[in-house]
């Protein structure tokens, strides 16, 4: 399941991810340093639709400077590269076999191209804590927590990184 999450996240196909590997329950949740979202419609709005709008805006900006770039959904990830590897899995299935809890460490990066052809990149060292629930068609993500240990611009020394307060504090 988490391998499919990493795949969808890298492609930016968050709507397909929500449809395929997340629980059908109404109380699914996603937490990252920017905030906490609960409910299927809320996750569609934040995790899927907002990402697509961001990708479209970036693509429109790039197309202004390069008329060969077509602004269409198939190109929304153009100029972006996301990768979040999954390491050190720790998975425990409840005695009743209906739920599971798991943790991973993720070393990732996000790179975005600017309209002028330059790129910016960010390194991310994160912890994932995920609750799974077993449904008729297999294990599904129920709750997903992303904790950021370190995130800094690529090319800058880690020692210059200044930690930010978590959202809401």
Regions found by a protein language model. Name each.
Residues 108-122, 151-152:
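Short, cysteine-centered beta-strand-loop-beta hairpins and adjacent loop/turn segments enriched
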Residues 118, 160-162:
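Flexible, surface-exposed loop regions and adjacent strand-edge segments
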């Amino acid at each position: 399941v988490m391998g499919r999450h990493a795949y969808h996240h890298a492609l930016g196909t968050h709507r397909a991810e929500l449809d395929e590997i997340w629980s059908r329950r109404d109380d699914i949740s996603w937490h990252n340093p920017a905030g906490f979202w609960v409910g299927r419609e809320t996750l569609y709005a934040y995790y899927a639709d907002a990402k697509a709008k961001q990708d479209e805006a970036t693509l429109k900006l790039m197309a202004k400077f390069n008329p060969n770039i077509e602004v269409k959904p198939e190109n929304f990830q153009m100029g972006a590269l996301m990768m979040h590897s999954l390491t050190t899995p720790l998975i425990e299935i409840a005695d009743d076999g209906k739920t599971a809890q798991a943790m991973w460490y993720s070393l990732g990066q996000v790179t975005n191209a600017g309209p002028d052809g330059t790129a910016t990149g960010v390194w991310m060292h994160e912890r994932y804590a995920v609750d799974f629930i077993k449904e008729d068609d297999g294990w599904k993500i129920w709750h997903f927590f992303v904790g950021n240990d370190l995130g800094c611009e690529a090319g800058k020394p880690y020692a210059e990184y200044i930690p930010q307060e978590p959202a809401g504090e």
